[in-house]
A protein has these predicted regions:
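N-terminal carbohydrate-binding accessory modules
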Residues: 1-40, 53
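Substrate-binding cleft and catalytic face of glycoside hydrolase catalytic domains
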Residues: 29-107, 111-123
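Residue-level preference for nonpolar/small residues embedded in alpha-helices
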Residues: 24-25, 62, 136
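Conserved beta-strand scaffold positions in the cores of enzyme catalytic domains, especially
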Residues: 5, 45-47, 185
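Extracellular glycoside hydrolase catalytic/binding regions
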Residues: 21, 97-101, 105, 110-114, ...
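Short, flexible active-site-adjacent loop segments at beta-strand->alpha-helix junctions, enriched
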Residues: 7, 12, 83-87, 119-121, ...
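Short active-site-proximal "capping" loops at secondary-structure junctions
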Residues: 11-13, 46-50, 160
Length: 187
């Protein structure tokens, strides 16, 4: 399925604290699908950065509402962890894993909800990734899979591509280490 849509930032913005949370109405979500032909909302649900001290789950109640509204509008909802302007970094792997342990079970039965492991977890392009970065992707994938075995998982959210084989190298590594691509994809 080709995904097309809009993004929402509930992680506090870039930098953290610069952007207020916006909750779209049911009517606006319905319009995205019916009038504009979109099928997806991409949500930076919470942020992993040095300036963001909010605990995992601080947006859960609002996310529950958005999950319901997206379902009613026949929209996919991609949930991810933002960077708060510290793009290309993992500030706290503990935060990321706790995020998926919290939200994975919460939405695992919602077939319109997809999980993006972490938005822009490494600097620059796919060519700058090293095996440790791929190991981090595996750890996130395994944590999500333990909590939500059937939810679509989006991996390898690059900022850009520098050489043609970069993604293939990462996909080969992840495949060798157990990613099941029948229910996972490159973001």
């Amino acid at each position: 399925t080709l995904l097309r849509g809009v993004s929402l930032s509930w992680d506090g913005g870039d930098p953290y604290g610069s952007q207020a949370k916006f909750m779209p109405s049911q009517a606006s979500l319905d319009a995205l699908a019916q009038e504009y032909g979109y099928n997806t909302v991409h949500l930076y649900l919470e942020g992993d950065s040095s300036g963001n001290t909010d605990p995992v789950g601080y947006n859960a109640a609002d996310c529950d509402i958005l999950v319901e509204r997206c379902a009613k509008a026949n929209l996919y909802l991609i949930i991810t962890i933002g960077c708060n302007g510290e793009n290309g970094a993992i500030h706290s792997m503990d935060f990321i894993l706790d995020f998926w342990r919290f939200y994975g079970p919460r939405y695992k039965d919602r077939t319109h909800v997809l999980f993006e492991s972490k938005n822009e977890p490494v600097h620059f392009t796919a060519a700058h990734w090293v095996p440790k970065d791929w190991e981090d992707q595996m750890l996130m994938y395994e944590t999500i899979r333990a909590a939500a075995p059937h939810t679509m998982v989006l991996l390898l959210s690059y900022m850009g591509f520098r050489y043609e084989g970069a993604v293939s190298d990462a996909v080969r590594y992840l495949t060798t280490h157990g990613v099941d691509w029948s229910n996972a994809a490159v973001a």
